[in-house]
């Protein structure tokens, strides 16, 4: 199992519409990816590790798939449409990482 993490840096003055992300963008991504997206989670940044520190990321999602190949096969054909929707909820450039889920 792999996890695709898409993280949005918590830059001062940035725009991020959490409601749109939760209610429209992620369900659209799931619909386009079909069964290749086993599940996903959405996180809203609250704080950093030190008291009073801001969260490094304002929001993020984690998309769970069987393999890198299954993610790429499902996401690739829809990448343009999915990425075009980003402007509807943020002006931030997402940071993406694909990880192997070791325990979970």
Regions found by a protein language model. Give the residues of each.
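Macromolecular interaction modules
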Residues: 1-104
């Amino acid at each position: 199992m792999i996890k695709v993490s898409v993280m949005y840096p918590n830059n001062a003055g940035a725009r991020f519409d959490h409601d749109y992300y939760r209610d429209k963008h992620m369900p659209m991504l799931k619909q386009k990816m079909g069964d290749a997206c086993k599940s996903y989670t959405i996180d809203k940044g609250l704080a950093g590790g030190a008291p009073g520190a801001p969260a490094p990321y304002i929001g993020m999602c984690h998309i769970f798939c069987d393999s890198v190949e299954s993610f790429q096969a499902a996401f690739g054909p829809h990448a343009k449409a999915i990425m075009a929707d980003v402007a509807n909820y943020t002006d931030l450039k997402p940071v993406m990482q694909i990880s192997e889920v070791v325990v979970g």
